[in-house]
Amino acid sequence: MSSSSVSGIREAFLDFFEKQGHTRYPSAPLIAEGDASLLFTNAGMVPFKQRFITGVSDVKTATTSQKCLRAGGKHNDLENVGYTNRHHTFFEMLGNFSFGDYFKETAIELAWRFVTKELGLSKERLWITVYSEDQEAFDIWKKITGYTDHKIIRISTSDNFWSMGDTGPCGPCSEIFYDYGDGVPGGLPGTDESDGARYTEIWNLVFMQYNRDESGELHKLPRGCIDTGMGLERIAAVMQGVCDNYETDMFQAIIDRSRSIFGSHDHPIAHRVIADHVRAASFLIAEGLTPGNEGRNYVLRRIIRRAVRYIYQIVGDKFSLHEVVPVLTREGSAGYMGNAYPEIVKAEQSIVSTLKIEEDGFADTLRRGTGILEQEIRGLKSGEVLSGEIAFKLYDTYGFPLDITLDVAKERGLKFDEDGFNRCMAKQKEQSRKHWKGSGEAQTASSHILNKHKATSFVGYENHRVKSMVKEIFCSGEAVTSMGEGEEGIAVLDITPFYAESGGQEGDTGLLKVVTTKCGSVAEVVDTTKSNNVHLHKIRVIRGTLKVGDVVEAVVDKQRREKLRANHSATHILQSVLRTLIGEGIQQKGSLVAADKLRFDFSHALPLTKEQLRTVEMEVNRQIMANQPVIIDHCSLEDAVQEGAIALFGEKYNDQNVRVVSMGSSKELCGGTHVRFTGDIGAFRIISETGIAQGVRRIEAITGHEVVSSMNRDSESLQQVAECLSVPVDQVIEKLKKVFVEQREINKKMATICYTHMNSCAKCIEVGSEIKLYVGEFSNIPVEVVASYVKEKMHTNEVLAISTTDGKRTTFIVGVGESAIKRIKATDIVKALQQIQGKGGGNASIARASLPSEYSAKAAEIIRQTVIDAIQNSGA
């Protein structure tokens, strides 16, 4: 076989069976078409299921490399990914199929020929299993392999008897195992130690010869069918001499990319998870799936979020899973999958944007949930039990995925109280069911509040601190009279200065200080939301006890509030400026007003140009520096709209009384908190402008001190550049231009020298034809220079194969002239180099290949022989 790379093995398998008369089919989609019993295609035979069931087929034999996914439903490997050598969510299944054509003997003979002849595996390393009652298969294997009885193992369990379901086609199966040798733990198939890695199943051959009826009785089929499956990742590991799928060339390329982005820290499991999950997510998104909360969409969301959680484990808040994608979609890497699945290349932009949106949306949930979980397990030792109630609270209250809780528990060696979690889940479902029926029993906290309390008196526009009374406390959804230190829950006050999350603005945080007792009890307000205008203060008691009836001093985190004010007011000005400068048709599609940044989503078909962004930024800052007053008015909705106030589409307003916020050119209906003068914003800086959906753009920006910090960082970087160039800061651009001009001149001179050297040293090799083959091996000449030389020197009847090496890898640039192309293509030569680990691509006239430098001499001979063979085969 020419190459042991993943792509090389895939092609070798398909080519082998194609030559045996099989029809090569492209992979079916991962989203199983027309099969309600499956979430995803999870085996190679799935696309042919109806052919097996009905016995009707327009072809008799077929071969495929099928994309498969096992993450959800009956076949779910998600939780094991990263912890074992062989579990994957996404994988490729090589298979050959017979629909009433050949049967056992031919299937076994073809399989044996492929693994021993095509792959070149030693028969001493191979073992066979058969179903204990399948004497026919045993005899065929013995005849074809020449094995003694002990090398063909009889298995009596269901592992060696396959069925499509409770009824329908079924039959015994036979497996080929590879023995990695004494250095790897594990026992023979069928033994207690068979779970070890030493003996690895590489191919499963299913002989469908029966039909099982509803009573369970087996009936012989008139014509047997064959369904085989060979995991590409497993056989690649065998061929590459490793017993870990994640050490194969494809996975190593993805893992290397992951390490380059997130750092080569000691987190091997995390990088494995990232490598596996980015493949799965990318292929699902390429098929049009988007993250969601149900069915297949939820499985995609789980996969992405699990990967993000492992990224968080490595580097904290750098959520950049999307940056790994190019290793799959761009040529030049062993991780490239576009040659077999071009759809992933076409969908690159969609994949990247979808991943980024999901990462951003999950970031806050992950940070908060991880912090709470760490607090809960801090005192637990390995072997102890993580409470199911805690896991459920994280899941239910904070939206923290159970998968991630289980992963953390597994890493810490903790057991998990699954029964406790299920009890909480069942209780919640019962509560929801009763509430839906209107029974009034076991009401949830929010429904209890709606029935008992009037709207909270909000005084936060004018005050940061007020005295208030605790009217109600809820813990785990139940009304309680008090909460002790360390407990979390919800407090309802009669008066509050805390702004509740609304209109994109995050809720206030701060403290509740008990003043009715001398114990100094304090609760931290970690978030504020509202239900039917009743403010719900999410609290954690940090000292003493908080009781219903306590008088508290409610204190808003003033510094955070001021940042929120600035960002909210800046968002208003930004929208007004966009409508003025870019287009009146712009509509708000979403927003986030956080303490550290603002985000504004708006309708617009095209990306904003650099000049447009610069103009927008300057105009926003002009209005800030004008220090205009922010005016708050109340009027009817009709009057506000007539005065030109912007109302958010789909938002519900009080027709008789709306709050109108005006500043500079902006006039909007808004209930949020704002600065008193635009100058209080300080400054405004756009940090990004991106597309998040078709026709929707997103601007992210910072204000105030964040702008100063950002500019200081930029200034420091510029100063460092100036020091490196030994010029004042104001001369950096001119100096760089001069350096670039000088570098281009140096490059030209270097290219001239290199051209002269290559001209004098390149040799013409005899290939027995009027076609001339020129080869040359050089050291440390830039690849771009070699490529330019080949393009310039390539004549109509010539083949050039010029290489350059850095001592570790050698890159060949192959050029084929216009007449010579009729007999050999540049890509034919590059493909021939795959047998010595050559990787690359190109077109018929010019291509490149990179390979380990120790194979350089052998490469020259392969090139020569490839050209000679091509000339002879063309009849020259």
UniProtKB/Swiss-Prot annotation:
Keywords: Aminoacyl-tRNA synthetase, ATP-binding, Cytoplasm, Ligase, Metal-binding, Nucleotide-binding, Protein biosynthesis, RNA-binding, tRNA-binding, Zinc. It is found in: Cytoplasm. GO terms for cellular component: cytosol. Catalyzes the attachment of alanine to tRNA(Ala) in a two-step reaction: alanine is first activated by ATP to form Ala-AMP and then transferred to the acceptor end of tRNA(Ala). Also edits incorrectly charged Ser-tRNA(Ala) and Gly-tRNA(Ala) via its editing domain. Consists of three domains; the N-terminal catalytic domain, the editing domain and the C-terminal C-Ala domain. The editing domain removes incorrectly charged amino acids, while the C-Ala domain, along with tRNA(Ala), serves as a bridge to cooperatively bring together the editing and aminoacylation centers thus stimulating deacylation of misacylated tRNAs. One of its GO terms (biological process) is alanyl-tRNA aminoacylation. Zn(2+) binds at H568, H572, C670, H674. It is an enzyme of class 6 (ligase). SMART domains: tRNA_SAD. It comes from Anaplasma phagocytophilum (strain HZ). This is Alanine--tRNA ligase.
